[in-house]
Every structure is written in C-alpha cells, then in structure tokens.
Amino acid sequence: MSCTKLFVLIFCVLQTVLAGEKPKAHLGGALRFNYNYSDWKEGNKHRGGDFGFDVFRINVNASWKKIRLDAEYRFYARTSGGGMLKYGWVGYQFNDNHVLQLGQNTVPFGAMPFNSNNYFFSINYYLGLEDDADMGLKYCFRKKGWELDAAFYKNADLLDFSEGVETSDSRYAYDIAGRNKEVNQGNLRVAYNWGERWKHQIGASAMYGGIYNLDTEKMGSRYAFAIHYTLNWKRWNLKAQYTTYKFSPENKEDEPRNQITMTAYGAPYEIAAHADTYTASLCYTFPIDKGILDEIRLYNDFSMMHKRKAGFNDSFQNITGCMLGMGPVLVYVDYALGKNQPWLGNDWNEAFTSATLEKGWNARLNVNIGYYF
C-alpha cells in the first residue's frame, strides 16, 4: 500500500468517526535522528561515526462510542525498508475489562509492551518475539490484577496478495520470509500483577502456528513459549524472561531445515530454527526537573541466544545506556556490545545461525534523538 493510499484511508476513517456523536481523535508522531560509531566499520571509525535521519512516524488514535482505532505508520530511508505500517487496528471496547482488536495488532508475547529499555530492544526482537504485530483478531481482558490476551493471526503483515509472492522485506518487526510464510498463528498470554510498594508481574506466553512453503506447498509448524517476571520498586525496574522456540519448515529436500529466513527493514537474514533465549534488564530513573531536563534513566539490558543445533555458536547482546527525558524530546545514549549479532558485527547472514566468522565482541556507540508530539 502506497503512502498516499494510506493517508487517504486514514482520512476516510477519521471522517467517518468525526461524523458521529462527540468523537475523539488525536494525531501524533515523532521525528528522530541517529548517530552511530561502529568499531567493526573502518570507514565509519575514520569519519568519527555517522549522523543522519532515523524515522518520521505518524500516530492516529480515534474513538467513537465503543469503537476504537489505533495506528502507527513509519517512514524510514528507502534502504531501511521505506514506509511501513507498524500497527493499525479497529476495535470494540465492551467496557474497561474487555476489548477486541481487529487488524495488524501487537502480538501478545512475553513482558509487554517491551522486554527492554534501550534503542536496540532485546535479542528477542530480532527473532520476531518482541514488539511484533501481525494480521488478525485479538481479545484483551484486564481485571483485578489479571491480564489475559488471546489472539488468532491469519498471517504476518501482508503487502501483496498475489499467489506465490514472498513476504516483503519492508516491515518494522521481524517475520518469516524467503520461500516460507507465517500462517494461522494462535497466541495466548496470561499475567498476574500484585503488590503496592513492590509491584510484581509474573506471566506465561504460548504461540503455535503454521509455516507454508511456497515451493513444496506443504505446511510446516512453529511454536514458542515464554515465562517472564517484572518488578517495579520506587525508581527501580527489573525485567527477566526465558523463551524457547522451534520452527519446522517443509522446505525442498536440498534446502536446510535447521535455519530459516527472517526479514525486516529491507534486509533479510537467517536464524537458527531451534533456540532458547535469556534476557535480563535493570534500570533506575533519576528525577531531575531542572531546566529542560526532566529525568535520566540508567539501564543495562542483557540477552543471549542459545542455539540447539550442534556446531551453531551462541549469540550475545548487552546494552548499557541512559535515556534523557526533556519534555517531548527523548535522547537514548547506548553502548551496545554484541557477539554473533548481525546488527553488531560484520557477519550479517550467519550470525544467528552457525556464526563461524565472528571471533569476538563488537561495540557500537549509538545516540538517538527524537521529538515526540
């Protein structure tokens, strides 16, 4: 869908909403720029890093009676995938406890809304298991500390309905790509919150779905399970999560089944088809309220990927950084360390599979500056 068609669609929906009784609508967004200094890129180091455009996004939130609309569209550089819908759904809010969402909505899995604090997210994001949105129907229940989300997703965000077409690389979150496609996915997430001073949450998530191969026209399968725990105490926040997943594609006989293609931001790569991940995040917020600086949030986010295939080397990621809050301006300063992580090293296609090229850790200093409105 082109940007022009998307804006026309959003305009028409808003016009419909505004024609009703006492509608509510809000238009927001953000403009972000990014600086990075990567120690594995010789040219980047000689230049003292690079600074440029990151993303411009538009958010639309509207309601009429019990009908809700929530959407976010992002504009990246063409080399990073160009324009893409992050999420967009129409829903019905029965009351404060029950909501239905239809469309491209956020997949309920693990600690939410994020399993991390930094610009890079956790390693789960790069496997399609954090901050992902797919096309389907989701039911949300909230009452007396309980959270229940049940969803069915027909497929990942689909941009071309033609038969036999591979999944587009222009997407925000990672989905299965290449000659395989995500289909008929079910998700269930249950979490319980308790405590007043020490605010705890413990939860479990499950996902099961199909993998349709365009060549063999056979249906494979995939699953993922996770347990998570979060704690908020005063200005401290802790997140911890264990995740296991397995993809079983029905590829052609001459193609490997111990790895699978994933894609986002216009650049696909391979990941291990069977792995466990471990994540742990800790942050502390300092209230400042002086001048333009409201707060400083310090954090360290660690995650690792243990690959079940013999001979596949594990992947690691550790992000130490801070977020500076200045009214509508947020600045993330991150020192990212990665080992066998495609975004943090020279090995793009095999870092999440065999990972035989990288021998040590790589580092990236990243500063992201955004104005949110």
Per-region residue spans from a language model:
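Outer membrane beta-barrel
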Residues: 22-38, 47-159, 191-195, 333
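Sequence/structural signature of outer-membrane beta-barrel proteins
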Residues: 34-42, 74-79, 109-111, 116, ...
